UniProtKB/Swiss-Prot annotation:
GO biological process, one term: ribosomal small subunit export from nucleus
UniProt motif Nuclear localization signal: location: 257-264
Keyword Lipid metabolism included in the entry's annotation: no
PANTHER family xref list: 18S RRNA (GUANINE-N(7))-METHYLTRANSFERASE-RELATED, METHYLTRANSFERASE-RELATED
GO cellular component labels: cytoplasm; nucleolus; nucleus; tRNA methyltransferase complex
Reaction(s) catalysed by this chain's protein: guanosine(1575) in yeast 18S rRNA + S-adenosyl-L-methionine = N(7)-methylguanosine(1575) in yeast 18S rRNA + S-adenosyl-L-homocysteine
Localization per record: Cytoplasm; Nucleus
The name this protein goes by in its record: 18S rRNA (guanine(1575)-N(7))-methyltransferase
Subunit structure: Interacts with TRM112. Interacts with ECM16.
InterPro entries for this protein: Bud23-like (IPR039769), Bud23_C (IPR022238), Methyltransf_11 (IPR013216), SAM-dependent_MTases_sf (IPR029063)
Intrachain disulfide bonds: none
Region (Disordered): 256-275
Gene: BUD23
Enzyme Commission code(s) on record: 2.1.1.309
Amino acid sequence: MSRPEELAPPEIFYNDSEAHKYTGSTRVQHIQAKMTLRALELLNLQPCSFILDIGCGSGLSGEILTQEGDHVWCGLDISPSMLATGLSRELEGDLMLQDMGTGIPFRAGSFDAAISISAIQWLCNADTSYNDPKQRLMRFFNTLYAALKKGGKFVAQFYPKNDDQVDDILQSAKVAGFSGGLVVDDPESKKNKKYYLVLSSGAPPQGEEQVNLDGVTMDEENVNLKKQLRQRLKGGKDKESAKSFILRKKELMKRRGRKVAKDSKFTGRKRRHRF
């Protein structure tokens, strides 16, 4: 079965018919509610917090935010059809049309926390030739870090296509300044396995609740080790510098009895541009 990200950009894939079908499905409503409750458990927030819902769609996760803890929330999404469906449902939160890959357009320190359900995997997909997934991830995490208060928390449930996408997301978050890691629910199950990115933007003010990091299983060091292990299993090697490559090849030619130029301080250096 094809993933939605591979079929079309989100603003096209979630058209009017898909938005109504998605919102009206009781199965989708149940799954979204379950994942939102799990995200709230990981956030460990005080009541009446101000939350940003990233990729809010038609507001299924926003309804849970209102019901659980009387949180005030604001949602953003790239699909006009999804937002129109949400407006027709008279949600209590505010809705905004925005591509999260272009950044979070809010004043610094606006939100106590942020949540995202089944959305950030879209950032890893290049819909057009000018969309670079790594740049979009960095822009997203940098602007999100700024939009959160000091000690603000972010939990995102997402569906990665492969381990490389998990690595890219985690490393972009670390570079932006977030601490935290990955929580995997039901890791042994192929069907029910769920990935939750659990992050915190610095230390919270004294007396406030800490982000719930129980079950965090991956950090930046483990990601790098995992990547190295995959390279070894695939037979891949670490990148070799141009100079060491040339010296190795010259040594090989010498052993084979070929005539080879002597080494000098200029061996392996790039030539200057003449013009």
